[in-house]
């Protein structure tokens, strides 16, 4: 956001888009006004809405959670080297040490709009499965966020309309992939759509049940695979 504002972009928070009309120019309608643009980018990832129903059926929002322990007296017993680790479970766990020897641990997911009341308890269970010696170590911080996944865990690049583009469904790898997607979208708007057109050919099936029933069906499936 700071980088965008530094080159002249204006950001309007709490201004939800209620409809998008293709152009040229494209029109984005809000409750109190409208914006004109040569291109509209749908960059809502796990927050897809009725503005883009065909793509919302292909990107499932899930919530992921992390905790930080108190500084560890013997961090080398947890990780011998300063590396980040992720396992290969269907609902994966991932962790690393911070500069002040806290264990930053991510694990546990939920589906739908609600977060668990106690994120500490949600994440402590998988943490203790991997590191039982940390069962009595205090957890000092807990947080979470909503991301978007696809059925094949590959990002979704698509043309929503002649002058509407979308990139989403980074499936837990958005720190790296979202920046790359931004470059590809910028290239496309500037007139070079070669990489966008290539990536848009990646098959991205809709989730069973579409946008309305994907949540309950996905919850059952993820619970089964997590066993």
Q: Language-model features: where?
A:
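Helical element adjacent to the flavin cofactor pocket in flavoenzyme catalytic cores
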Residues: 1-38
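Hydrophobic/aromatic beta-strand patches that form the interior of the parallel beta-sheet core
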Residues: 12, 41, 165-167
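Active-site substrate-recognition segment that forms the wall
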Residues: 17, 34-73, 77-162
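Hydrophobic residues embedded in beta-strands of well-ordered beta-sheets
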Residues: 26-28, 102-103, 164-165
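C-terminal catalytic lobe of FAD-dependent flavoproteins
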Residues: 109-226
């Amino acid at each position: 956001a700071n980088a965008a504002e530094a080159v002249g972009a204006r950001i309007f928070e709490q201004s939800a888009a209620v409809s998008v009309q293709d152009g040229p120019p494209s029109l984005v309608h809000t409750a109190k006004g409208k914006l004109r643009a040569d291109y509209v980018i749908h960059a809502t990832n796990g927050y897809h809405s009725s503005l883009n129903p065909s793509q919302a059926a292909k990107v499932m929002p899930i919530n992921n959670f992390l905790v930080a322990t108190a500084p560890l007296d013997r961090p080398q017993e947890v990780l011998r080297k300063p590396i980040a680790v992720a396992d290969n479970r269907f609902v994966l766990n991932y962790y690393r040490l911070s500069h002040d020897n806290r264990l930053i641990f991510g694990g546990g997911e939920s589906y739908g709009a609600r977060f668990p009341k106690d994120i500490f308890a949600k994440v402590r269970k998988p943490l203790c499965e991997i590191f039982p010696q940390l069962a009595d170590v205090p957890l000092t911080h807990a947080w979470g966020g909503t991301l978007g996944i696809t059925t094949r865990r590959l990002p979704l690049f698509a043309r929503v309309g002649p002058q509407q583009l979308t990139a989403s469904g980074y499936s837990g790898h958005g720190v790296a992939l979202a920046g790359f997607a931004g470059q590809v979208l910028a290239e496309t708007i500037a007139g070079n759509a070669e990489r966008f057109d290539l990536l848009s050919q990646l098959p991205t099936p809709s989730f069973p049940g579409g946008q309305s029933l994907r949540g309950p069906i996905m919850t059952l499936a993820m619970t089964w695979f997590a066993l």
